[in-house]
Amino acid sequence: MRLNTLSPAEGAKHAPKRVGRGIGSGLGKTGGRGHKGQKSRSGGGVRRGFEGGQIPLYRRLPKFGFTSRKAMITAEVRLSELALVEGDVIDLNTLKAANVVGIQIEFVKVILSGEVARPVTLRGLRVTKGARAAIEAAGGKIEE
């Protein structure tokens, strides 16, 4: 067997449809587009969501909600992710340096998910009740 002798299995490949190449092909003249109408023309077709002039669904339904700008700069950090940070004191800058949170994040809340293996000091971060208990049980502390 050589690379130049390899070929697909018989029947594995289908020949492409050759549209508009004579009546004998079955796809001649109109090329499978039927007669006249918007969809038969070049560039023909309607935009997404168009319902023939009827008010489309996306306009019949009311607008709702908004995107909180604070949510874009807030992140939750699991207890297990604190192990990725070097050093005993953890604050926003050390979390960013360890790539635990993104550069644009300004507010962080530590949540109870996973375990904290070593005593750490959290500085300037918000902490849930469960996470606070787990950190203090491991010998760590939380500074405001």
Swiss-Prot record:
For the region Disordered, give the residue spans.
Answer: 1-52
Give the record's keywords alphabetically. Ribonucleoprotein, Ribosomal protein, RNA-binding, rRNA-binding
Q: Write out the biased-composition intervals (Gly residues).
A: 21-31
One Gene Ontology term of the molecular function aspect: structural constituent of ribosome
Look up keyword Kinase and say if it applies. no
GO BP annotations listed: translation
Cellular component terms, GO, for this chain's entry?
cytosolic large ribosomal subunit
The record's annotation in Pfam families points to: Ribosomal_L27A
Q: Which residues form the signal peptide?
A: none
Taxonomy, superkingdom: Bacteria
User: What does the protein in this record do?
Assistant: Binds to the 23S rRNA.
| Family assignment from sequence similarity | Belongs to the universal ribosomal protein uL15 family.
Subunit arrangement? Part of the 50S ribosomal subunit.
PANTHER family found in the cross-reference section: 50S RIBOSOMAL PROTEIN L15, LARGE RIBOSOMAL SUBUNIT PROTEIN UL15M
The protein depicted here goes by the name Large ribosomal subunit protein uL15
Q: Which gene holds the coding sequence for this protein? A: rplO
